[in-house]
């Protein structure tokens, strides 16, 4: 009985420690174990969400009107403008792969956010200067046709500085925000599930403000005034983020995340001829008390050949300590390598969705320019059509969080309602519907080009709204999937993987436009992409994309069914 009482007391002490302290290897601002009541959770996340709002405000204030700027101020033709938008969008959303790597391996997420946001701010300052300094200002449209070279150079340097800033800001900030919630604490784990939804509500609020207030200022007042506003808001949010420093929980960078992956492959190949042990528990693993830099993972049968990296050749404790990490690795390191391999097919099978998403900021906006934008006595700025997407996203996320998740949870017994990959797949179906609607509307618009009165821009409302539903399911699902399904030490890179879907899709979109354009000219003698929309056949391109997405959904279903989820060993307090 005494032994049982002692055991119960130890468990109670462990539980009490978990309630008081955060024991997930994070640190407070002074390098100590964080006190749960004073750090992290929503008290810290709100500071982080504030800077995300301002970053999305700045990004979409520029991105949604970029094609308009290139075709009107810089006088680029449609194909050149779309290519430049896609190149910039591609670089902006691929740069997080580098930023996430630097954050996880060397600088840490907090420091990376500070450095990246400073670079972002430099880009905004240069952009604003290019509209006010006489030597850099664009020439007036009525005075000259050719754009002023100095302005063009300053403009592109500025927007690519913003790309570099986004590269460090986006993956680090979102993963830093999620780090404020302890996965081993029941209440905080529930909060974390809500965090990604409310993160996206804040993101949408930034987008909504950008495509209404900022777009109106750019359209009616001037790009320079809009630049001043965006620069000031970003500077204020950086100060707010810095003020939250005492409340944050920090994770120390763990070195290059690529080295352990390479070590697993080298060790598995070196021991390829050894037999598998009779029981997975015989594979090399450290105890929970020894492992303080993260969480231990459970063994999975998937990619079993990599298990050989954890086969113990000499069970002598002294020999184990001296064993090279290129010869023997823990089971957790092996499972982390499997996780990286698992996300690769998911990444590829979501690229078609990314291609659909890129249309909203390019061709959808260009369609709006050619249509009647008068509603009552008000002229709608083209970029303000994104208001419908942002509102749909906010409403659908709120309904999903407050109504659908509790309902689905009671049916499926899954804390998320449905699993992450099911959520992603649902959004892909909405993206298919978006392309079908867009094709039908564009055909209707082309049929009316000979009429004196153009179609109302309201006809574009359905495609802007349905893509909002697609984003609510797929984009948010991708954020959760890549954050949770990569090793804990690679979470900034995990967010970068999600962003890189859009980045790679932007470049693929350019390749598709070029390939489809060439094929159309060879077979029919007429390009699908003329100098303007009225001389193009954008409806056919949309039907082509609908076919690509439909085929991709079938591939995604097959991949998703075979893809296992991360399996974490319960902590001592929870077990």
From Swiss-Prot:
Phosphothreonine modified-residue sites: 112
Subcellular location: Membrane
Keywords, sorted A to Z: Membrane, Phosphoprotein, Transmembrane, Transmembrane helix, Transport
Transmembrane segments: 44-64, 88-108, 113-133, 153-173, 195-215, 223-243, 339-359, 375-395, 420-440, 457-477, 493-513, 541-561
GO MF annotation: an example: dipeptide transmembrane transporter activity
Gene3D superfamilies: MFS general substrate transporter like domains
CDD domains cross-referenced by the UniProt entry: MFS_NPF5
Similarity comment: Belongs to the major facilitator superfamily. Proton-dependent oligopeptide transporter (POT/PTR) (TC 2.A.17) family.
Database matches in PANTHER family: OLIGOPEPTIDE TRANSPORTER-RELATED
Protein name: Protein NRT1/ PTR FAMILY 5.6
Organism: Arabidopsis thaliana (Mouse-ear cress)
GN (gene name): NPF5.6
């Amino acid at each position: 009985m005494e032994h049982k009482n002692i055991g119960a007391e130890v468990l109670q002490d462990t539980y009490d420690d978990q309630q008081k302290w955060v024991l997930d290897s994070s640190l407070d601002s002074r390098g100590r174990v964080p006190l749960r009541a004073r750090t992290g959770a929503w008290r810290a996340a709100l500071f982080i969400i504030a800077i995300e709002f301002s970053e999305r405000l700045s990004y979409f204030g520029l991105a949604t009107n970029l094609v308009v700027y290139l075709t009107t101020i810089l006088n680029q033709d449609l194909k050149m403008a779309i290519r430049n938008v896609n190149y910039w969008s591609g670089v902006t959303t691929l740069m997080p792969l580098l930023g996430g790597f630097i954050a996880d391996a060397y600088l840490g997420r907090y420091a990376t956010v500070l450095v990246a946001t400073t670079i972002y701010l430099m880009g905004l300052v240069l952009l604003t200067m290019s509209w006010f300094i006489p030597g850099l200002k664009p020439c007036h449209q009525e005075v000259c046709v050719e754009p002023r070279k100095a302005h063009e150079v300053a403009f592109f340097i500025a927007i690519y500085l913003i790309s570099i800033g986004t590269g460090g800001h986006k993956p680090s900030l979102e993963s830093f925000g999620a780090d404020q919630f302890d996965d081993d604490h029941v209440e905080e784990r529930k909060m974390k599930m809500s965090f990604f939804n409310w993160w996206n509500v804040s993101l949408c609020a930034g987008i909504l403000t950008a495509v209404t207030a900022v777009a109106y200022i750019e359209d009616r007042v001037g790009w320079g005034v809009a630049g001043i506003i965006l620069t000031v808001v970003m500077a204020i949010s950086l100060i707010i983020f810095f003020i939250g420093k005492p409340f944050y929980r920090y994770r120390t960078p763990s070195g290059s995340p690529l080295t352990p992956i390479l070590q697993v492959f080298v060790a598995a190949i070196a021991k390829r001829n050894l037999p598998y042990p009779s029981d997975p528990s015989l594979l090399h693993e450290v105890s929970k008390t020894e492992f303080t830099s993260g969480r231990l993972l459970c063994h999975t049968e998937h990619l079993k050949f990599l298990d050989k990296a954890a086969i113990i050749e000499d069970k002598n404790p002294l020999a184990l300590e001296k064993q090279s990490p290129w010869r023997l690795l823990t089971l957790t390191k092996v499972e982390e390598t499997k996780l990286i391999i698992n996300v690769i097919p998911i990444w590829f099978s979501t690229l078609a969705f990314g291609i659909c998403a890129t249309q909203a900021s390019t061709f959808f906006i260009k369609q709006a320019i050619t249509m009647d934008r008068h509603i009552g006595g008000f002229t709608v700025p083209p970029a303000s059509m994104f208001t419908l997407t942002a509102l749909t996203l906010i409403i659908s996320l709120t309904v999903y969080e407050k109504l659908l998740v509790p309902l689905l949870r009671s049916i499926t017994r899954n804390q998320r309602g449905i699993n992450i990959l099911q959520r992603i797949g649902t959004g892909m179906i909405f993206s298919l519907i978006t392309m079908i609607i867009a094709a039908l509307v564009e055909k209707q618009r082309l049929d009316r080009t000979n009429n004196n009165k153009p179609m109302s821009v309201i006809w574009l409302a359905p495609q802007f709204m349905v893509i909002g539903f697609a984003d609510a399911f797929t984009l948010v699902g991708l954020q959760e999937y890549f954050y949770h399904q990569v090793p804990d030490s690679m979470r900034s890179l995990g967010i970068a993987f999600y962003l890189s879907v859009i980045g790679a899709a932007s470049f693929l979109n350019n390749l598709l436009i070029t390939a489809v354009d060439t094929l159309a000219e060879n077979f029919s003698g007429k390009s699908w992409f003329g100098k303007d929309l009225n001389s193009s056949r954008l409806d056919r391109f949309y039907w082509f994309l609908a076919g690509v997405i439909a085929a991709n959904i079938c591939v995604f279903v097959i991949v998703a069914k075979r893809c296992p989820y991360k399996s974490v060993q319960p902590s001592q307090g929870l077990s």
